[in-house]
Amino acid sequence: MVNKEQFYDQIRKALEDGNTRYYRNLIYIERDDYFDHVKEIISLFLNFKSNPSVAYGFVPWASGSKERMRTIKEYFSKFDDIDYANAEYYLGNTYDLVILDTVDNFQPINIGRLVDLARGGGLIIIYTNNLIKDKTFRTSIMRNGLILDEYEKRFKRKLYEHEGIFIIDVNEYIPKPFSGNTMPKAEKKVPRNPLMPKEIHELSLSEDQNRVIESFTYLLSGGQRALVLTAARGRGKSAATGLSIAGLIEKLRERKEKSIRIIVTAPSIASASQVMSFAKLGLEALGEELSVKVSDTGHIKSLRGDYFKLEYVPPDAAIEDEGELLIIDEAAALGINYIDLALRAWKKVALVTTVHGYEGSNKAFLRYLRRLIESKRIRVKWVNMEQPLRYAKGDPIEKWLYDALLLDAEPSEPQYLNDTMIYEDVDKSELANDDNRLRAIYGIMVTAHYKNNPDDLMIMLDGIHHKIKAIRIGENSYIAACQIAEEGELSDNMVDIALKGGTFDGDLIPDRIIKHVRIKDFAKLRGWRIVRIAVAPELQDKGFGSELLKMIYEEARDKGVDWVGSSFMSDQKVLNFWIKNGFIPVHISPKKNEKLGDYPVVVIRPISDIATKIVKISAYMLKEKLLNTLHDVYFNMNPEVVRLMLTSTKIVSKTINVSPIILDKTISFLQGVSPYESSADGIHMLTLKYFWDGERDWSLTQDEELVLIAKVLQGKPWSYVSTVLSSNRTHIYELIYSAISKLMKKYYNLTADSKVGLTLKDVMNSQQYD
């Protein structure tokens, strides 16, 4: 144990060493007189660095928070006060000092985002009066006023375990200076005979970036090609991508006489801002005179020169756009379905994404992506960046952050596959205190999802209504894991809130059913929502996920639960997994999730009689909503997902009557007399009849169903439908003809050889014109 003076002296030495070796230090303060210590640490840091750049994270609307911020701001001339809710807009910045006020809220995503903004030689200060008491995010996880604190206990334990961290708590000062090794600071290394312009290479900050810039020339060669660039946060991938675009424009100019067009897309224009900014920097270094268009939010929208245009285009529009190259930044956030369409529509594609880190896609995305590209037989180059730019490799705070937030969790390899499978109800307190088990179970969960959030672990460990189920083989070899949230049994007041459009934390599935199906009885039922279910990568597609789901369903039934359900992004493969296990789609959001790039879906497998009745009604309402609004609300929904939704709700049906006039016009279409455009109303009616028919024991081919959905129900352009089916307009037309021929024959025994023309009596006898 040391006294305050000795403690501060060790901090001074650590700051000097950190500056020399380009690593960061962190000070954690948790005590009632926290603010006095914060001010003392700031004074100490100012003696070390007189005019630092500062990022200050806080909750501006909380009582007293602005006063604390203003007091601290007086110490500095370069000061960014950052509302945690808007932290993503500062992710490209770097600071000497990062201060995180966690008095009002302790939330892992805020720690993950802002700690990484500190540069080597810099300092991070995290301060609070109490890590658990009166915290906004913790309150949102509570159920019936109850919550655990397993996550916070583990977080504090990790502070004590790692180096480069100095702790001021209620009773003592605990210095943990860094004694490890770091790699030298990243430096550029311009290739001796570069393929890209030397001016572009000179703008890089690391040898890693130089390597990436050269790698982008892979896209200049013939045939369909993709480049996949992955990196943890802080490696400079967006900067390298932007500089590479500038270099490619210069190389393309040497080859092409016509104007060059390159499209950049991302979940938002803000997400693409770094790519566009560094492309501008690179083009200016090449001596280009640029016309720059900026969005209302201040982000670069397009760069135009005499012979080229570089433009940000929203994801859906980018699919149908044209140009030499499509750049997809933060590709994992847009999902595999989107990338599939992009690879069908574009000849040259660069996919850039974060792996690991607080917003990383982890290995699941890369695994799905590798399968997708292999199935298309596209030439691909995989490039990974490892050298951090903001700080030295070996930085102790990065090591602590990844461990504390489990940003690099990976499952262990399964052992003892010949042993008996054991279904386990996992004790969360034991799990939080056993890093090997926690990494094994949580690692399985995160590797199965494209996009992960550090908050997920806190919700799982602290939520008293969140349970963990797993299958293990032997003593400690986990092969499948599941996180369950208990939902339902809502009060009348919560039901009224939902019916009036209000929202509340938790109870996701009851909320959606109340809002969209309007049946209040569902709110009183007990349900288990499966938040995540996953299988170790080596054992996927072998039935273990279905086996775990079966065990969970049987346990729920035995405990008197009314339903088991789940909500997830509308990925075709994931949706198919739930459907084949007896789950019924009951809701799809009318809006895309902007961060995850797809439409959230709700599926339920009912247990009780009342749940079964409500689920059937919900499935009917969903089918009606889809078939009535695919041309509008769900115009951008993947047709393959629509097909699964429609064909999996055959438990509900409705009779669609088609008039003799419509049928007669459709015969003319089959005879080649009436073109598609003139017969579209009849084709549309027959399509509705087919998808509403829950009693048929036959089906069209998958391609025929897809073309009816994309062209007839969604009203997509011929070019888009051709892209979806990797075909051409002639073949698409033939598929429509084939499908309508079958429907006319099956339902009405009519063919292209049937007679055309009606009498008034024929029409009046149909009883549709009385």
Curated annotation (Swiss-Prot):
<dbReference type="GO" id="GO:0000049">
    <property type="term" value="F:tRNA binding"/>
</dbReference>
<feature type="binding site">
    <location>
        <position position="209"/>
    </location>
    <ligand>
        <name>ATP</name>
    </ligand>
</feature>
<feature type="binding site">
    <location>
        <begin position="533"/>
        <end position="535"/>
    </location>
    <ligand>
        <name>acetyl-CoA</name>
    </ligand>
</feature>
<comment type="similarity">
    <text>Belongs to the TmcA family.</text>
</comment>
<dbReference type="GO" id="GO:0051391">
    <property type="term" value="P:tRNA acetylation"/>
</dbReference>
<comment type="function">
    <text>Catalyzes the formation of 41 N(4)-acetylcytidine (ac(4)C) sites in RNA, almost always on the middle C of a CCG motif. Modifications are found mostly in tRNA, with small amounts found in rRNA and mRNA.</text>
</comment>
<keyword id="KW-0699">rRNA-binding</keyword>
<dbReference type="Pfam" id="PF08351">
    <property type="entry name" value="TmcA_N"/>
</dbReference>
<dbReference type="InterPro" id="IPR027417">
    <property type="entry name" value="P-loop_NTPase"/>
</dbReference>
<dbReference type="GO" id="GO:0019843">
    <property type="term" value="F:rRNA binding"/>
</dbReference>
<keyword id="KW-0963">Cytoplasm</keyword>
<dbReference type="GO" id="GO:1904812">
    <property type="term" value="P:rRNA acetylation involved in maturation of SSU-rRNA"/>
</dbReference>
<comment type="function">
    <text>Catalyzes the formation of N(4)-acetylcytidine (ac(4)C) at the wobble position of tRNA(Met), by using acetyl-CoA as an acetyl donor and ATP (or GTP).</text>
</comment>
<keyword id="KW-0819">tRNA processing</keyword>
<keyword id="KW-0820">tRNA-binding</keyword>
<dbReference type="InterPro" id="IPR016181">
    <property type="entry name" value="Acyl_CoA_acyltransferase"/>
</dbReference>
<dbReference type="GO" id="GO:0051392">
    <property type="term" value="F:tRNA N4-acetyltransferase activity"/>
</dbReference>
<keyword id="KW-0012">Acyltransferase</keyword>
<keyword id="KW-0694">RNA-binding</keyword>
<dbReference type="GO" id="GO:0005524">
    <property type="term" value="F:ATP binding"/>
</dbReference>
<dbReference type="InterPro" id="IPR032672">
    <property type="entry name" value="TmcA/NAT10/Kre33"/>
</dbReference>
<keyword id="KW-0547">Nucleotide-binding</keyword>
<dbReference type="GO" id="GO:1990883">
    <property type="term" value="F:18S rRNA cytidine N-acetyltransferase activity"/>
</dbReference>
<keyword id="KW-0698">rRNA processing</keyword>
<protein>
    <recommendedName>
        <fullName>tRNA(Met) cytidine acetyltransferase TmcA 2</fullName>
        <ecNumber>2.3.1.193</ecNumber>
    </recommendedName>
</protein>
<dbReference type="Pfam" id="PF13718">
    <property type="entry name" value="GNAT_acetyltr_2"/>
</dbReference>
<dbReference type="GO" id="GO:0005737">
    <property type="term" value="C:cytoplasm"/>
</dbReference>
<feature type="binding site">
    <location>
        <position position="390"/>
    </location>
    <ligand>
        <name>ATP</name>
    </ligand>
</feature>
<dbReference type="InterPro" id="IPR000182">
    <property type="entry name" value="GNAT_dom"/>
</dbReference>
<dbReference type="GO" id="GO:0002101">
    <property type="term" value="P:tRNA wobble cytosine modification"/>
</dbReference>
<keyword id="KW-0808">Transferase</keyword>
<feature type="domain" description="N-acetyltransferase">
    <location>
        <begin position="458"/>
        <end position="608"/>
    </location>
</feature>
<dbReference type="Pfam" id="PF05127">
    <property type="entry name" value="NAT10_TcmA_helicase"/>
</dbReference>
<dbReference type="InterPro" id="IPR007807">
    <property type="entry name" value="NAT10/TcmA_helicase"/>
</dbReference>
<dbReference type="InterPro" id="IPR024914">
    <property type="entry name" value="tRNA_acetyltr_TmcA"/>
</dbReference>
<keyword id="KW-0067">ATP-binding</keyword>
<dbReference type="GO" id="GO:0106162">
    <property type="term" value="F:mRNA N-acetyltransferase activity"/>
</dbReference>
<dbReference type="InterPro" id="IPR013562">
    <property type="entry name" value="TmcA_N"/>
</dbReference>
